[in-house]
Regions:
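A short acidic, often aromatic-flanked loop/helix-cap motif at beta-alpha or helix-coil junctions
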Residues: 56-62, 108-109, 131-134, 194-198, ...
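Class I S-adenosyl-L-methionine
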Residues: 1-103, 110-111, 208, 217-218
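A contiguous loop/helix-start segment that scaffolds small-molecule binding in enzyme catalytic cores
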Residues: 2-6, 145-238
């Protein structure tokens, strides 16, 4: 069988596609991906065999190409980084194709943290964007906030099943109902980050209640304070 790659193409802007991923995409024969993801790399895939998929029909495309791949190279592009919020799909690709080379990309998590000036080494990163139950992740969110960490979070859009829908408004209500004073909690919500349609809400968690955001949203709870090396003079002073 030919080579199979799972690659991250960044949050949405072609400027955030890494050079190694560009090279892999340009040299491949077949691509299987979502419309939004393929749009990010559209200038690199002209003339390729392309399968545009949805969550409902992706399995059909993987199974179709499996016996037809031969010695050709297949690329499955992912928005952001392959290693974040995509493990269920990557696991399935490994089950189907066996050897899959994973190439990371720049995540919306990284960009959102940078936009909000929140260092990841003082933050907890949580994704609710999974199909498995998220009750433990909700508790993880509470604990991180109580412990004083900033939190960079990917919410879960599931409008067809309200009990699973956990977007910024639902998260704000959840935190308030669990004893947090959301009127004093600072938060950013970025939508379509790095693209021409990027938006940034900045305010309190309380203000999120009743607001609608797209499925391309990332939240940043900002509890960071400046703590430079000048607070640790012992490193160079005798």
């Amino acid at each position: 069988m030919g080579k199979v790659y799972a690659v991250g193409v960044g949050p949405g802007s072609p400027k955030y596609v890494t050079e190694i991923v560009k090279e892999i995409v340009q040299n491949c024969d077949v691509l299987i991906g979502y419309k939004y993801t393929l749009k990010t790399i559209e200038d690199l895939i002209e003339g390729k065999e392309i399968y545009e998929i949805t969550m409902n029909d992706q399995e059909k495309s993987y199974q179709k190409i499996l016996p037809e791949l031969g010695d050709r190279t297949l690329v499955i592009p992912f928005t952001g980084d392959v290693n974040f919020s995509e493990s269920e799909v990557v696991d399935r690709l490994i089950e189907i194709f066996g050897e899959v080379e994973i190439v990371p990309g720049i995540s919306s998590i990284q960009v959102a943290a940078s936009r909000a000036k929140v260092p990841l080494d003082k933050s907890k990163v949580i994704t609710m964007h999974v199909t498995t139950p998220i009750e433990d992740k909700k508790l993880e969110l509470q604990k991180a906030l109580i412990d004083g960490f900033s939190v960079v979070l990917v919410p879960r859009p599931w409008p067809k099943q309200p009990d699973k829908h956990f977007m910024p408004s639902e998260i704000a209500i959840y935190l308030r109902e669990n004893g947090f004073d959301t009127t004093k909690m600072k938060v950013h919500v970025f939508e379509a980050i790095t693209t021409e349609n990027e938006t940034n809400f900045e305010g309190t968690v309380k203000e999120l209640e009743g607001k609608e955001f797209s499925d391309l949203s990332v939240m940043v709870f900002n509890q960071a304070s400046l703590d430079s090396y000048m607070n640790y003079r012992w490193q160079w002073e005798n």
